[in-house]
Amino acid sequence: MRSIDGIAALVGQTPLLEIRYSYNGQPRRLYAKYELLNMTGSVKDRMAFYIIRRAIERGELQNGAVIAEATSGNTGISISAIGRALGHRVRIYMPDWMSYERVQLMHNLGAEVVPVSKAQGGFIGAVKMTQEYLAENPNTFLPRQFDNPDNVEAHEILTGPEIEAQLAQFGVAADAFVAGVGTGGTVMGVGRHLRRGARKVRVHP
């Protein structure tokens, strides 16, 4: 399937690191996923890769199509890298107050970055602009990270089982799961997997 299978080797299967500490004199252990080892150094690579792969499988992303997405940072970096590897033009719409380094990295990955001011609606304006671009350029794919069910599914069927299998190698199961929240895909997807079968696992965003 084009070069998507080659990219798969660069996303996921990151190490699970054991962190030992004590609390109130009692030994405790935390386990941290080292997501820096993903393709662009972010957990967002998982979601971006899965959304694009599923779009190709469903015929929604055709050869020569433009990938356009509204993002504030890491997802845009992931889409820029994966899109370029697959030979797609990538247009990223993002608020103009995001860091210079993020914008420059996307440029270096070959993406076009469209800055959106507060007067233009900021992030909500960026989302609207991707829709307007699609209306004018039909051969465009919008990942729609905020309302695409593939976002959560990526973590429910891939990240969650990966974490569970790695914990099993330490001889433990999860009592709780903590993740940062952007779109909510990571915490929702992994949480669903870890809680399947009515297991009592605390999930904290």
Residue ranges and their predicted role:
Residues 1-205:
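PLP-dependent amino-acid enzyme catalytic core
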